[in-house]
């Protein structure tokens, strides 16, 4: 053993002894603590999303904010958000749409999303956290659903803040990460970490919608997959049709 390693080892042992805990006991206690915390997290039972218990909240998918997104191209993000909205509509989920400072700062919702949701009102607000706006909060709570799927720009603010608020209210919050966007890698990584720490469930938009679909024999299946417009799914369908001939 090198001199430095010996001294470090001796120092750790001495520190543990001074605290009245043998080195091995201290390590064992720490591992036990970690195990208990991991087990407590694992005890949360899986309760799937369904058409009856979920709602979709789309936040601040506005032209001005879209231009600053750096973790997805504009085309890819639009594709994902519109696919999420159309699939949710096919699955008959309640959908809440909101913008912030539409006329003074960030502009309107991007046109493709508006076209995908004809007749769905868009609530414009001034609050940063959408859940702080009484009209948005009322629209969400009026659905009677306890599982809330959020997507927004930016990920770490517009999606994260209301999702974490929902968790604080005893609701289950999900964030469709690839239907959200942000302005730097740091914002993305810290935002994801903060949401995980708060108990928000992170996923991608297609997985969330397929979870709700549950059974490919459902009449809505074709509309859901068509809405998500996944190139690989189209390829699989084409191959299946070819082999079926």
What do the PLM-derived regions correspond to, one by one?
Residues 33-127, 142, 172, 189-196, ...:
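Active-site acidic carboxylates
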Residues 140-146:
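Glycine-rich phosphate-binding loop signature in dinucleotide/nucleotide-binding domains
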Residues 102-104, 129-130, 155-159:
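Acidic, metal-coordinating catalytic cores used for nucleic-acid/nucleotide bond scission
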Residues 1-5:
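Secretory targeting signals
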Residues 125-138:
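Short phosphate-binding loop-to-helix
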Residues 7-27:
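N-terminal export signals
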Residues 147-198:
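A contiguous pocket-lining binding segment that forms or flanks enzyme active sites
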Residues 109, 135, 161-165:
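A short acidic, amphipathic alpha-helical/loop segment
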């Amino acid at each position: 053993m090198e001199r430095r390693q010996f001294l470090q080892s001796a120092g750790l042992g001495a520190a543990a002894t001074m605290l009245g805990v043998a080195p091995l006991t201290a390590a064992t206690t720490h591992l036990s603590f970690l195990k208990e915390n991991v087990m407590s997290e694992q005890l949360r039972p899986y309760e799937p999303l369904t058409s009856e218990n979920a709602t979709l909240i789309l936040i601040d998918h506005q032209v001005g904010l879209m231009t600053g997104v750096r973790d997805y191209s504009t085309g890819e993000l639009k594709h994902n958000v519109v696919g999420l909205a159309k699939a949710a509509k096919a699955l008959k989920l309640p959908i809440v749409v909101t913008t912030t400072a539409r006329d003074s700062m960030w502009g309107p919702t991007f046109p493709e999303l508006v076209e995908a949701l004809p007749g769905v009102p868009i609530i414009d607000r001034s609050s940063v956290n959408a859940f702080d706006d009484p009209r948005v909060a009322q629209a969400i709570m009026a659905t009677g659903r306890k599982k809330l799927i959020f997507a927004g720009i930016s990920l770490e603010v517009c999606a994260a803040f209301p999702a974490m608020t929902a968790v604080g209210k005893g609701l289950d919050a999900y964030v469709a990460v690839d239907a959200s966007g942000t302005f730097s890698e740091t914002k993305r990584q810290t935002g994801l970490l903060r949401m995980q720490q708060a108990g928000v469930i992170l996923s991608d938009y297609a997985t969330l919608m397929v979870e709700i679909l549950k059974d490919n024999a459902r009449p809505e299946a074709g509309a859901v997959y068509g809405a998500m417009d996944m190139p690989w799914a189209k390829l699989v369908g084409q191959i299946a049709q070819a082999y079926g001939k």
